[in-house]
A protein has these predicted regions:
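Shared catalytic-loop signature of beta/alpha-barrel
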Residues: 1-89, 93
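C-terminal extensions of enzymes
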Residues: 75-120
């Protein structure tokens, strides 16, 4: 489809496509064909944050689609902070990695399963 010029925009969702690496690959393939990328989110605040960071890393990212009802609703119930949307523009979180930090109340739940990886 790309080689035949049948695609005007490529839109994908980080969770559905397979994660950060797969999204970067898809974005690079689209860029090689001068196709702009639009990232989609309707799967939660971590996916939203991943998409924001991907948008910052892709020179061909042009738009980001998310559900305002989720962003202003339950997304903020799960995380300490979500990337700020201001006048149609979004900024990535500051901090290590993606900058994501779950609210303590979710970590303290009796049925929470916490796994820490210390890869070096």
């Amino acid at each position: 489809f790309l080689q035949k010029g049948l695609i005007d925009y490529m839109m994908f969702d980080p969770i559905w496509l397979g994660g950060i690496t797969e999204c970067l690959k898809a974005g690079a393939i689209a860029d090689a064909h001068q196709i702009p990328v639009s990232i989609h989110d309707c799967n939660g605040p971590v996916n939203f944050t991943v998409g924001v960071n991907l948008s910052m890393a892709m020179t061909n990212a042009c738009t980001y689609e998310t559900a305002r009802g989720f962003y202003y609703g339950w997304y903020k119930e799960l995380l300490e902070d979500v990337p700020l949307i201001d006048h149609g523009f979004v900024s990535p979180l500051k901090g290590d990695g993606l900058g994501v930090k779950l609210k303590d109340k979710w970590l303290e739940e009796s049925n929470s399963n916490i796994v820490i990886s210390n890869l070096k």
